[in-house]
Amino acid sequence: MTAKFRILVLNGPNLNLLGKREPGIYGAATLDDIVGRLQQLAAELDVELTHKQSNAEYELVDTIHQAMGTVDFILINPAAFTHTSVAIRDALLGVAIPFIEIHLSNVHAREPFRHHSFLSDVAKGVICGLGADGYEFALTAAVRHLERSSNN
């Protein structure tokens, strides 16, 4: 049976170090833990979920381009690229796939340079400060958005 929706999860630089890097800020869960929980939830929701993590901006841009016509929604934690990447913003706008921006920490309670996002104003929504649970909330919200859109 074909999945109801296809959702792409993108994770940016240094997220491969989750569980080791600053656990007081980012939590103890590894990226594999987070993606595993997401895969379980996706199966329950009848969603096909694919994941990519990269420390290279161009790889994330290429993956976004390749998603056109094959993905219904994107969940993205751009990490440090949040504050610097016009290229990722333009790629997301170019493919016109709705997306939710995710951050493990509350970026607004951190250093001032982390307060600006190049993506937030064009995202369907932003989830920050809820740790690894934010990914699951984002997946659930994406599915609800897609269900509402397909019923109209």
UniProtKB/Swiss-Prot annotation:
It comes from the Bacteria. It catalyses: 3-dehydroquinate = 3-dehydroshikimate + H2O. Transmembrane segments: none annotated. Its EC number is 4.2.1.10. Keywords: Amino-acid biosynthesis, Aromatic amino acid biosynthesis, Lyase. Catalyzes a trans-dehydration via an enolate intermediate. Homododecamer. This is 3-dehydroquinate dehydratase. It comes from Tolumonas auensis (strain DSM 9187 / NBRC 110442 / TA 4). The lineage of its organism: Bacteria, Pseudomonadati, Pseudomonadota, Gammaproteobacteria, Aeromonadales. The gene is aroQ.
